[in-house]
Amino acid sequence: MVVVGSARIDERGNANWGKAGDQTSREVATEPYYKHRLGWYLLRPKEAAVARKIGLAMVEACLNHNIGYDQSERYGIINCLKKYGRIAKINEPTEADCSSLVRACCVQAGINVGDFNTSSEVSVLEKTGAFNKAVVVTNDTKLCAGDVLVTKIKGHTVIVTEGYPREDEKPTAKPKPDKAAGKAKKSIEEVAREIITGKWGNNPERTNKLIKAGYVPAEVQAVVNKLLK
């Protein structure tokens, strides 16, 4: 199944003036891919490694309930990314809209990109040189994690967080053993199984605990999802 993540709507179903942070756990969230009534353009990162970073950044945003939706405070996510260095580490209530969140994910992935909205997104992202030329999404399009989708006219933008494997994607290298002194760090699967049993508590506390323990919450959650299928 193809899954996309995005900043969607505030806690009252409005676009502006909501309370900072995700009040419903659905303001910034993942959902199954859907056909938009305005149609989608696809912007695919040229490098598989960059695509993976973009997709992971969006998962981090969807898991971090400090990030909510508000067009009037859309630059909050950008400012907090500069302050904390990573979306998963943002530790104060802030806001984003769909395009500023996509921008933040691209910045975290190492792409130098300025401001844009859904009207200018295609041209701005193409000019970075990090993406292939935009194409129209059809029924035959196989979407991959890290793909950026934006409506053909001003509307909405999302990032694919789960999808088909890229043809150029190499197998991920096995992680090196943790050389830190003391108790060995648990594997991601061990932690995922502990989360399922409730040992790590609930979000947002769980996310903070994972970060402090040296884990990337999005990677752990991906394993949790697989174990629960």
What are these regions (language model features)?
Residues 194-207, 215-217:
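Extracytoplasmic Gram-positive cell-surface binding/anchoring modules and repeats
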Residues 131-139:
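Short alpha-helix capping/helix-loop boundary micro-motifs
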Residues 165-181:
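Low-complexity, Gly/Ser/Thr/Pro-rich intrinsically disordered linker/tail segments
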Residues 51, 55-59, 99, 103, ...:
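Extracytoplasmic/secreted envelope proteins and their assembly/folding machinery
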Residues 1-109, 153-156, 162-164:
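N-terminal capping segments
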Residues 143-147:
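Loop/turn positions that initiate beta-strands
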Residues 176, 213-229:
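Repeat-associated, polar segments at repeat-unit boundaries in modular proteins
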